[in-house]
Amino acid sequence: MLASVALAALAGVGTPHATADDASPLVPLVDAAAQRLQTADPVAASKFRSGGAIDDPDREQQVIAAVTGDATRHNIDPGYVHDVFRNQIDATSSVEHTRFAQWKLDPAAAPSSAPDLSESRQKIDTLNRTMVDEIARQWPVLHSPVCRPDLDRALDAVATARGFDPVYRHALEYATHSYCR
């Protein structure tokens, strides 16, 4: 709840102190990417508890096919969307690998239970659609000279509002590093 309030304030919604210069139009896209990254913990817990592999090339291909199809329907470059989601998947997978390593080194920190993987995947699929919608909405910004400063402001706002630790902050930076073209 606090993160939502902070993000709304950072985006200039409902706050008299925000100006057009304060808000980045990329906050909704970056926040969707951040929420998608945050699925790494429950997904890692599910895979850790079940003995499943972190990397799932078949699932990754399904995701890429779905988002590039959505890109085509939005009349935006599917190659661009492919690159964005490849980075997002790699960042999320890296967080999962980090969690596995932490739990291997400290078994007491390992989760004693985990949500069903299908629940996390439904959330991921919804966030994927949101991200493609936001990419389409922000296409002109993503391909303009103001993209980098807008992205930097959005990254700072979202990472702060979500209380990201260094692992998640670096993962978010990686997930978004190809946004500006």
From Swiss-Prot:
Gene3D superfamilies attached to this UniProt entry: Chorismate mutase
Any GO BP: chorismate metabolic process
One MF term in the entry's GO annotations: chorismate mutase activity
Enzymatic reactions: chorismate = prephenate
Highest rank taxon of the organism: Bacteria
S-S pairs: 147-180
Coiled coil: none
GO cellular component, one term: extracellular region
Domain spans labelled Chorismate mutase: 21-100
Transmembrane segments: none
Signal peptide range: 1-20
Enzyme class label: isomerase
Pfam family, one: CM_2
EC number: 5.4.99.5
Residues reported in the UniProt entry to bind substrate: 36, 47, 56, 59-63, 92-96, 121
Location within or outside the cell: Secreted
Record flagged with keyword Signal: yes
Alphabetically ordered keywords of this record: Disulfide bond, Isomerase, Secreted, Signal
Pathway per the UniProt entry: Metabolic intermediate biosynthesis; prephenate biosynthesis; prephenate from chorismate: step 1/1
Subunit structure: Homodimer.
Function description: Catalyzes the Claisen rearrangement of chorismate to prephenate. May play some role in the pathogenicity.
Protein name: Secreted chorismate mutase
